[in-house]
Amino acid sequence: MIEVSKAKGSYIYDNNNKKYLDFVAGVSACSVGHCNEDVINAITDQSERYMHVMVYGEFVTKPSLELAKLLANNLPKNLNCTYFTNSGTEALEGSMKLARRYT
């Protein structure tokens, strides 16, 4: 087993600073790389305002409102309502309920 001590971009490093190309990556690193400066800055900025807000109708956040407007402006006119969910499971369950109600 190789103990990882740090990672940057597409590479991981062991305790001896030996560099390995990361073919496994993980959930977020696979698309943006390890320690991506833009992601670090966005996380830092967001964490200074709030970490998490439930957005199931009780509260809204500016980023979710902006995304909903962007989606509505770029989809067919009859697709103008957005409902954000917490996970793929909730999204799938919601889409099944909508399909059942529609048919």
What does each model-identified segment do?
Residues I2-F23:
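Active-site and channel-lining beta-strand-loop segments
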Residues K19-T103:
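Glycine-rich loop-to-alpha-helix module at the N-terminal edge of alpha/beta enzyme cores
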Residues M1-K8, R49-Y50, S64:
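Active-site-adjacent loop/helix segments that line or gate small-molecule/cofactor pockets in enzymes
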